[in-house]
A protein has these predicted regions:
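Small-residue-enriched hydrophobic alpha-helices in membranes
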Residues: 1-127
Length: 127
């Protein structure tokens, strides 16, 4: 598993914990990403262990994320914030913090978040 993908998953763990718990739906998304990123069994074990306790953006190795991976993390974070049926205030707040931490320009971030929210809401209708 590439270091950038590891950092993306860790970032998503912090988003999942934003509302104080990790839902079953959020766990499913994280597990799917481990598979999609071809995590080795040892890496998957490490990330599952990492996800067992509350995490914040301070726990995310953002410096390991390149240009595209930063945007990927933001888009996945928005999706993850909706996967349990609704985006709550804590999840909105961590996405705003994530935009700052990822150093994505405000206008670009606004468009990425808006597009991701629209896709997330459409996907929710399919579930």
């Amino acid at each position: 598993m590439q270091a950038q993908n590891l950092a993306v998953v860790k970032g998503l763990v912090s988003v999942a914990w934003a509302d104080g718990h990790v839902s079953a739906e959020e766990t499913e998304v994280l597990e799917a990403l481990l598979e999609a990123f071809h995590a080795l069994p040892s890496e998957a074990h490490e990330l599952r262990k990492f996800a067992q306790t509350p995490r914040s953006l301070a726990d995310v190795p953002i410096h390991e994320l390149g240009f595209a991976a930063r945007r990927q993390l933001l888009q996945h974070a928005v999706l993850l914030s909706y996967v349990d049926g609704k985006q709550d205030e804590q999840e909105k707040a961590i996405i705003e913090q994530l935009v700052q931490a990822l150093e994505i320009p405000p206008l670009e971030a606004r468009d990425l978040v808006r597009d991701s929210e629209e896709r997330s809401k459409l996907l929710l209708k399919l579930l």
